Curated annotation (Swiss-Prot):
GO terms for cellular component: cytoplasm
Official protein name in the record: Acetylglutamate kinase
The protein's role, per its UniProt record: Catalyzes the ATP-dependent phosphorylation of N-acetyl-L-glutamate.
Protein family: Belongs to the acetylglutamate kinase family. ArgB subfamily.
Lineage summary: Archaea, Methanobacteriati, Methanobacteriota, Stenosarchaea group, Methanomicrobia
Localization annotation: Cytoplasm
Catalyzed reactions: N-acetyl-L-glutamate + ATP = N-acetyl-L-glutamyl 5-phosphate + ADP
Chain positions recorded as substrate binding sites: 61-62, 83, 187
EC class of the enzyme, as a word: transferase
A molecular-function term among this protein's GO annotations: acetylglutamate kinase activity
Superkingdom of the organism of origin: Archaea
SUPFAM superfamilies in the record: Carbamate kinase-like
Primary location group: cytoplasm
InterPro entries for the chain: AceGlu_kinase-like_sf, AcgluKinase_fam, ArgB, Asp/Glu/Uridylate_kinase, Glu/AcGlu_kinase, NAGK-C
Amino acid sequence: MMKREDVLMEALPYIQQFHGKTIVIKLGGHAMVDPEVLENAIKDAVLLHYVGIRVVLVHGGGPEITEKMKALGKESVFVGGLRVTDQETLEIAQMVLVGKINKGIISLIAKCGAKGVGLSGSDGNIILAKKMDLQKVNVQGVEQEVDLGHVGEIEWIDPSLLTTLLDRDYIPVISPIAIDRYGGSLNINADTAAGDIAIALKAYKLINMTDVDGVMDAKRTHVFRKLSITEANALLASGAIGEGMIPKVSSVIKAVENGVKYSHIINGNVEHNLILELFTHEGVGTMISLQ
């Protein structure tokens, strides 16, 4: 068992390496419905902030949106890991993401003594999007086109507001609701939003906190510790990646292809996994890099 001082000394070179760097953290999965898990994740994020890392949080809320829809008697439908979003579903998503989850995260940051600013992607035109094209889906052997409704495809990220907040020692917290060119709102997949924000900010790392230990093989028995983007793309092409993981893996691949040095997928339900990933030699989860 390592001594406490050894743990701290192991962290020192990583603290030095990441000081002043931007790290985008996507909060998702069970953390969005379990207050204890979420609070632990926020404590870790605030610790990163206090050791000089420029932290940006992007949160999802899929399980809580699904739960709210169920309570209102509305069924959730997914195509390729994306939620089909009619007008009523969009309003529910906005209520849950912006009105509840985002504000709750800001309160937790304040409780830890830091300053957070809650934003949706439509604030300051951070995320400009267009309505997603019809999606092809195979239904009982027949290919059909499905309209996902008010689901957006990101056209542009304007990082200027986020950079201003980071420069002034705030932690930006972003919910994945975008704006289109006509002032309308669009639901954006939070994994995709986090990846594109990381690219726009020229982040050093993108960390996706979810409900699984990392990227797994087809049998779901082995977690890949490291993957190149070539290996990760091959896993996607082979069908080994489950539907819900497709946007996560796709977003981290895109981030690395576009200048983010490292992307990670880790289990956010395990206490202090974020700290273990960043500040220990072994790390946790799956790391994806160019090679």
